[in-house]
Amino acid sequence: MANKILVETSARHVHVTAETLEILFGKGHTLTNKKDLSQPGQFACEEKVTVKGPKGALKASILGPTRPADQVELSLTDARTIGVVAPVRESGDIAGSGACILEGPCGSVEVKEGVIAAKRHIHMTPADAAELGVSDKEIVNVKLDTARPLIFGDVVVRVSDKFALAMHIDTDESNAACAFGEVYGSIVK
């Protein structure tokens, strides 16, 4: 591996509960897997929703499987565009976060909290963490090897035997670093 980490751009997306899915798409609806993602068991869905704020709306894909709570992950540019608050948080840390409306073909849901801008993070297995000399929840810096090399600070390491090695950044961060196509980064101390 030699400290080479695949960097993936995570575009705006939504995680929904089974209850929200049925309100948006109809009773008994299940998510349709369009494409498996790099993290085992995660997938992009055929289903899309409209994310509405006081200043506008954006289309976003749903990622599966369903979750215990609704979560909307936007870039800060997306959040400003539609007029919603999106604090920078780790996935799942939604208490007191932003609000929006989700609209689907069969109904809408008010998300009272759940809008975030995802904190930069690296998924890795315990073996990856041992090889890279890092631990779960550690904060690291990562240099991207692109046409506009950039060192991202405040990157949280997430370790689980259910993960595959990959760093996730949002579209704002990706654009700043020209992180297009297959991009790799390395942890710098």
For each predicted feature, which ranges?
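Extreme N-terminal starter segment of soluble prokaryotic enzymes
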Residues: 2-4
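Short beta-strand-centered segments at strand-helix junctions
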Residues: 6-8, 13-53, 60-105, 110-137, ...
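Acidic, glycine-rich active-site loops and adjacent beta-strand->loop/helix elements
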Residues: 146
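Short coil-to-beta-strand transition motifs
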Residues: 149-151
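Short beta-strand-to-coil "C-cap" segments at the C-terminal boundary of structured domains/repeats
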Residues: 187-189
